[in-house]
Swiss-Prot record:
It comes from Bdellovibrio bacteriovorus (strain ATCC 15356 / DSM 50701 / NCIMB 9529 / HD100). Belongs to the universal ribosomal protein uL2 family. The gene is rplB. HAMAP family: Ribosomal_uL2_B (MF_01320_B). GO terms for cellular component: large ribosomal subunit. This is Large ribosomal subunit protein uL2. InterPro entries: NA-bd_OB-fold (IPR012340), Rib_uL2_dom2 (IPR014722), Ribosomal_uL2 (IPR002171), Ribosomal_uL2_bac/org-type (IPR005880), Ribosomal_uL2_C (IPR022669), Ribosomal_uL2_dom3 (IPR014726), Ribosomal_uL2_RNA-bd_dom (IPR022666), Translation_prot_SH3-like_sf (IPR008991). Residues 262-272 have a biased composition (Polar residues). One of the primary rRNA binding proteins. Required for association of the 30S and 50S subunits to form the 70S ribosome, for tRNA binding and peptide bond formation. It has been suggested to have peptidyltransferase activity; this is somewhat controversial. Makes several contacts with the 16S rRNA in the 70S ribosome. GO terms for biological process: cytoplasmic translation. Keywords: Ribonucleoprotein, Ribosomal protein, RNA-binding, rRNA-binding. The keyword rRNA-binding applies.
Length: 272
């Protein structure tokens, strides 16, 4: 895996970087693990925009990635590393000894021919899945469950990882990428290693068109909108006039907006 640069033959190519895709070993996805993916353009069932700056983009098929890793005590062999347009990391196609196939997130150090397994007796090596209670303290982990059996929800993007900071009888302490220290049930599962494609953060798209291919629409500043569209709109675009706010009037710089009391008890130390 590496980054390639482009000759500045146009304004869009100047400074543009991309992947060389040398780690990809299979270019066509496994048909049995594909599902249709209909674009919603970030609208809900009423047609209202629920997430701004999304829409368009290249047509995709969804890859059915196994985040639960609940096929226990059955070894699987990595037969391919593939590209997934729906996420920033690569995915690994694995084949179990009983013939079943599945996609998993490809961590750093996982190669074709390696063997992975979901078992509390498994070795501590990239790709294996264990319960948090069976993982040694200090291990780097990803694809972490927050509820037993629900599947991994934390640390699934390119280069993401968390650290198992401590263990107790019922809960384990996990240090999240944000610096937050969170307690998670020891029966929740996690995969060993750091998610692959760590160079993703170093990619320079180079031009607006590459963002549009990804389904990302332009972000317009509020002070360049009309007064009807944003609290900072109007005034010939000369200045804000007051503190920066969201389109709904909420302060957006240095103002804490978290109001999730349900999970407060699981947070040992807040993120910085």
């Amino acid at each position: 895996m590496g980054i390639k640069t482009f000759a500045p033959r146009s304004h869009g190519r100047r400074g543009m970087t991309g992947f060389d895709f040398k780690e990809i070993t299979k270019t066509t996805p496994e048909k049995s693990l594909l599902a249709p993916l209909k674009k919603q353009a970030a609208r809900n069932n009423h047609g209202q925009i629920t997430i701004r700056h999304q829409g368009g983009g290249h047509k995709r098929k969804y890859r059915l990635v196994d985040f639960k890793r609940n096929k226990l005590e059955v070894a699987a062999k990595v037969i391919a590393i593939e590209y997934d347009p729906n996420r920033t990391c690569r995915i690994a196609l694995i084949s179990y000894i009983d013939g079943a196939k599945a996609y998993i997130l490809a961590p750093v150090g996982l190669n074709v021919g390696d063997t992975v397994i979901s078992s509390d007796k498994a070795d501590i090596k990239p790709g294996n899945s264990l319960t948090l209670g069976a993982i040694p303290v200090g291990t780097v982990i990803h694809n972490i469950e927050l509820r037993p059996g629900k599947g991994g929800q934390i640390c699934r993007g390119a280069g993401a990882s968390a650290t198992l900071a401590g263990k107790g009888d019922k809960y384990c302490q996990v240090r999240m990428p944000s610096g937050e220290l969170k307690q998670v049930l020891t029966v929740c599962r996690a995969s060993i290693g750091q998610v692959g494609n760590t160079d993703n953060e170093n990619i320079n798209l180079g031009k607006a068109g590459r963002s549009r291919w990804r389904g990302i629409r332009p972000s317009v500043r509020g002070m360049h909108m009309n007064p009807v569209d944003h609290p900072l709109g109007g005034g010939e675009g000369v200045g804000k006039g007051h503190h920066p706010v969201t389109p709904w009037g909420q302060p957006c710089k240095g103002f804490k907006t978290r109001n999730n009391k349900r999970t407060n008890s699981s947070i040992i130390k807040r993120r910085k």
